[in-house]
Amino acid sequence: MIKGVVNKIFGTKNDREIKRYQKRVAKINALEPKYEKLTDEELKKAFNELRQKVKSGQMSMDEALEDSFAITREASKRVLGMRHYDVQLIGGMVLHEGKIAEMKTGEGKTLVATLAVALNAMTDEGVHVVTVNDYLAKRDATEMGKLYEFLGYSTGCITSEIQDDQERKKQYQCDITYGTNNEFGFDYLRDNMKYSLDEIVQRGHNFAIVDEVDSILIDEARTPLIISGPTNRKLDNYVKADQIAKQLEKDKHFTVDEKDRVILLTQEGIAKAEELFGVENLYSLENAILAHHLDQALKANYLFQKDVDYVVRDGEVIIVDEFTGRLSEGRRFSEGLHQALEAKEGVPIQEESQTLADITFQNYFRLYKKLAGMTGTAQTEATEFSEIYGLEVISIPTNRPVIRKDLDDLIFKTEKEKFDAVVKKIKELHQKGQPVLVGTTSIEKNELLHKLLKKEKIPHAVLNAKHHEKEAEIIAQAGRKGAVTVATNMAGRGVDIKIDDEVRELGGLFILGTERHESRRIDNQLRGRAGRQGDPGASQFFLSLEDNLLRIFGGDRIKNIMNRLGIEEGEHIESKMVTRAVEKAQKRVENMHFESRKHILEYDDVANEQRKTIYKFRQELLNPEYDIASKIRENRAEVVEELLSQSEIFPETPKDDFNLEKLSKVIQEELGTKIGVEEMKDKEYDELKNFLIERLEKEYEEKMGQLEEEQRREIERILYLQVLDNAWREHLYQMDILKTGIGLRGYNQKDPLVEYKKESFNLFMELVNRIKKEAIKTLHLIELRNEQEEEEIRRLEEELAKMEAQIAQEAVMQHGEEVKTEPVITKKKPARNEPCPCGSGKKYKHCCGKSGPKKGILAAANG
């Protein structure tokens, strides 16, 4: 209440920010006459002079903002025939400051982005504009590219159609690059699998503007991007697990928690599964794979629905994106879930894959020095944007007031009654000539409504993942008189639905929602399709107690209200109280998802630090100037120490107790070098260690000395990279296993997150030691051919080319299964003067707190 009074007197923080921006808008408007007078050539020259000042550091971007915005607006008037409104100038400033601009549908977000893009591209470090699909990326790059070209910029566009790396690289070299979140993310992962700097396509992460930022940074945050390849761990138990899952009875053998999407076997279920598998203990170590298969088979059969979560087409299971309703072709669920769905549907089961590289959108977008976003709906998730990405949400006023009427929800007892009422309402609107856009939450419901409308002979267009090719065209026509469009929640974001004067007279576009989504934001997006730029319009949701949201999260309370009111079949209730109860249920789901995403990030942050360390070292290895010789010397000394301890020889061991026979054998087995016991006799620990290091180095130098310096360095780098990549892939597999089983630690009164951090750190240290040891072993065992010094390099390069081609051919880009994790535990960041958690022994402020790991691990690479 006090907050409300304060806001009335002083205005909200958002109001104060808007006032601050309005002062600068006045200054930009004051510059308009000055730039209007200039010829095209003079205008281009003025912008180029401004750009050079920013590029050379004579002027900051913020100092150049007013002139840059004024010139960009003038150029837009001339090239595109569009003048930026004052509210669009505010939007541009919000984006430039690295915030999220919440702008209603039809307020011209695409044009707003040009202001911040043109200003931020002045540093020549590249600007990425991220959209939700290839169609929008191509459309915006083509349309806005004309404006950028006038200003002297080059514009590129990355789509899934561009397969050639050099062509992709060319697009990234442009001043401004448009593309989808998937393409940017996968290019980053692929770049970190390359064996030459020339093949890397991206050129850093300077500034990104994310269009439909809520969809990309929130809806898709729970599904990681994964590049996977075939694994030799081929398993053929999917069909068996599917047969068993189908024989188990719900509630008797297992319980289903739809709220958390979890299935748990009962004691009776475990006994039945053990009997059917023919094993004594389903949860013993040797049967862990069977238990995992059964878990995935149960999920596939009882949590995943055909035509809702996936479709079957041409003998393939294709994922339906739950947020956009589009088919995610080429993507596969991970951890054997996709194979379980294939077994369920009786289609050919494709080989299980192994993760080669993965990252979440949360961690990919946090790579950018500056990040900004635009959307029509962000305030409901303002807390999440702030906590996870450090992004503030600013609501931009509309250019014209919104006059759309948002009517109260109508609630029916059954789904059948609801759809009968929906068809009746559509018929009524169609006869009147008022266009209606009907929103459904799944393909299944979409097609059900399609059949009902067909039966009533109501002409209509259908838009879902199965008919998405003409998406933009269908949506653009949805505002015509008498048009009826039935769409899943993909609903053509980014495409305006325009109406004419006749339709305005009829009341504008009518939005009819057939079910509430789990997120209020997606409902608001649907409402926002109507009433753009001050147009009339209306929106209303028709619900039933059988809808998923009400059934799982809040049906009982509403059911009681309906029973008390004595609602008969076919009747509905329409009340503010019920609408509030529905919103309460949505808030509960949103909070649950927020906690889940936050928790996933805590887990992924552990893997992310490891990923950054490995990728940083990989980048160093790719640099031809990298001092690989020092790295090999350093690793050799560490490997010698390990071989000594392997032979039970330690600094405190008396020299007479040294097991030199074992040491001699270990050195020959591991490094292929024969050193006799006599040569090592009568030496103290340090003397013996130094003798071995020198002897191994001498032999290695004699062998590699045959090569020219450049050839030698190339062989060493390539071999080191191969060892690193193989070890990293194996590590990712181990991490997957760890993540799958870590939740069980909670039953042992242990915090799963703390345990995960501990175990993953141990795995990472093992990885680091394995890389060092394997690299030294490989380099010492390599045999050079005498005929021609270049032969070895040629052989390695051919092998490498084959390997890369194989990875490219076999790798599958996919979204992982939505990750489910344990309850949230807050992670405390170390204080500046505390010891660094990486184990370097330094204070946090002098180590990782400064600029990433410095010591030990792989960071000693420059030694």
Curated annotation (Swiss-Prot):
Q: Name one GO molecular function term.
A: protein-exporting ATPase activity
Provide the catalytic activity annotation.
ATP + H2O + cellular proteinSide 1 = ADP + phosphate + cellular proteinSide 2
Topology with regard to the membrane?
A: Peripheral membrane protein
Class in the EC hierarchy, top level: translocase
Q: Which SMART domains match?
A: HELICc (SM00490), SecA_DEAD (SM00957), SecA_PP_bind (SM00958)
Swiss-Prot/TrEMBL keywords: ATP-binding, Cell inner membrane, Cell membrane, Cytoplasm, Membrane, Metal-binding, Nucleotide-binding, Protein transport, Translocase, Translocation, Transport, Zinc
Tell me the protein family, please: Belongs to the SecA family.
Q: What is this protein called?
A: Protein translocase subunit SecA
Name the source organism.
Answer: Nitratiruptor sp. (strain SB155-2)
